[in-house]
């Protein structure tokens, strides 16, 4: 492989670390990684790639033309950076699906619909969907290869890290305060020891970009007091009975016992390999139910984004 790949990462510190860890494990030969601080790092926060310090650039000083690929995990109001990078010749991996509503931007989940990368050159942008959608797509893909589905219901239990690193810190702080009998401020949104509904727009549309034949998917999401790990309870229904026998794969691990986000975090802590864990599979009338868990930072975002980059590179983009 060509050893001249220059890669920029535009994400918060914690996610940037996980992307770099995954790049170090990739077969891609990368000459340089840089951080673009669209979300400013703390003074003591530094990234290392292959034991070397990584330069940290402000969005105002970056020359996007210096990079071949950009990992972007910013908010909708920051999409001007995506446009600038793409216009200057970079291939931009939109990690959070903020561009997924654009008809000429492909929405791709690795191993599921990589043929859509043919559309990449229209804008030099490809969207990885929201972690809720990518996790669901990976579990539905084997079913849709065998049968048609007329309805999918999914309830996602969202950890603090799904929002951002600041929310993780808030949850930790609130938990400690409440355990020590210190009440929260009246105006403070309570995260610890509580749950509440979470609204994420356009998830059904993102899923249909991946599976055009699936036009009835209902998403429910609940913010839960867990630090890391996205869990989903899924019911997939057809017009007739079907036999769902999932297999272990590169990305999916079948589990005989129930895996929760906390158990998954404990088991994968310190391990290079991360997977989407599937358990509690049971038949229902004309359908199937199952439970899936993944570390949405290390798996849904970092690993899938790097897998997407590898697919893009292998197709010559």
Swiss-Prot record:
It comes from the Bacteria. Belongs to the aspartate-semialdehyde dehydrogenase family. This is USG-1 protein homolog. It comes from Haemophilus influenzae (strain ATCC 51907 / DSM 11121 / KW20 / Rd). The gene is usg.
């Amino acid at each position: 492989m060509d050893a001249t790949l220059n890669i920029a990462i535009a994400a918060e510190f914690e996610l940037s670390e996980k992307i770099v860890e995954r790049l170090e494990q990739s077969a891609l030969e990368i000459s340089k990684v840089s951080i673009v601080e669209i979300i400013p790092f703390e003074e003591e926060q530094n990234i290392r790639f292959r034991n070397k310090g990584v330069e940290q650039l402000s969005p105002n000083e970056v020359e996007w033309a210096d990079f071949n690929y950009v990992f972007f995990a910013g908010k909708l109001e920051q999409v001007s950076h995506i446009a600038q990078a793409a216009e200057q010749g970079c291939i931009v991996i939109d990690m959070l699906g903020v561009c997924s509503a654009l008809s000429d931007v492909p929405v791709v989940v690795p191993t599921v619909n990589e043929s859509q990368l043919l559309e990449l050159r229209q804008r030099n942008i490809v969207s990885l969907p929201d972690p809720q959608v990518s996790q669901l797509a990976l579990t539905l893909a084997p079913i849709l290869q065998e049968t048609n589905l007329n309805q999918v219901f999914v309830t996602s239990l969202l950890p603090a890290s799904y929002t951002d690193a600041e929310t993780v810190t808030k949850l930790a702080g609130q938990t400690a305060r409440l355990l020590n009998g210190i009440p929260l401020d009246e105006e403070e949104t309570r995260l610890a020891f509580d749950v509440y509904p979470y609204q994420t727009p356009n998830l059904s549309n993102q899923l249909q970009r991946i599976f055009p034949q699936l036009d009835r998917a209902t998403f429910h999401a609940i913010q839960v007091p867990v630090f890391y790990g996205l869990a989903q309870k899924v019911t997939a229904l057809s017009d007739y009975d079907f036999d769902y026998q999932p297999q272990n794969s590169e990305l999916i691990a079948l589990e005989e016992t129930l895996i929760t986000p906390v158990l998954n975090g404990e088991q994968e802590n310190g391990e290079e390999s991360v997977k989407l864990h599937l358990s509690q599979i049971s038949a229902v009338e004309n359908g199937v139910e199952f439970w899936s868990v993944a570390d949405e930072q290390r798996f849904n975002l970092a690993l899938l984004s790097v897998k997407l980059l590898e697919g893009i590179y292998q197709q010559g983009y």
